[in-house]
Amino acid sequence: MNREILFRGKGNPKYNNGDWFYGYLLFDGDDYQIVDPRYGSCRRTVLKETVGEFTGMTDKNGTKIFEGDIVRTQPFYDRPYSATRKGKQFLGVVNLHIHTFKGNKIFPEQKYNSFWQVDIIEDTEKYNHYNWSRFWNCEVVGNKFDNPELIKEEEQ
């Protein structure tokens, strides 16, 4: 399986006006930097907490989905939702979840498993889904850095 390795980060206001940069991720001391091909080989210093990886997937409009994006989605099926939620759309945040587990006697080294997941917040309940094929009409509606109010509205 091949996918485009791409990162994004929001520009550090100390160095630029807070634009989003997309490209290759570099570390320079304590600085996180993105080399955005749109601007040649210039490095752009970005805020560490805003760095997110491209999932390799796009939404129904062809928009690339990055870690930290807020997506509106509707599950194909009810589980784990009750029948009263059937057909309802949900907002969720895209996150990369990394799990570690111990090996066995044959392979004692520690193992890692990672997958993309949508953490759905509805009322006071939280759900998560890691099987993207179970979603349809997924649409990026913002991200948790520029649009935190979308998640706060869902939590209330």
What spans do the regions from the language model cover?
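Secondary-structure transition motif
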Residues: 1-156
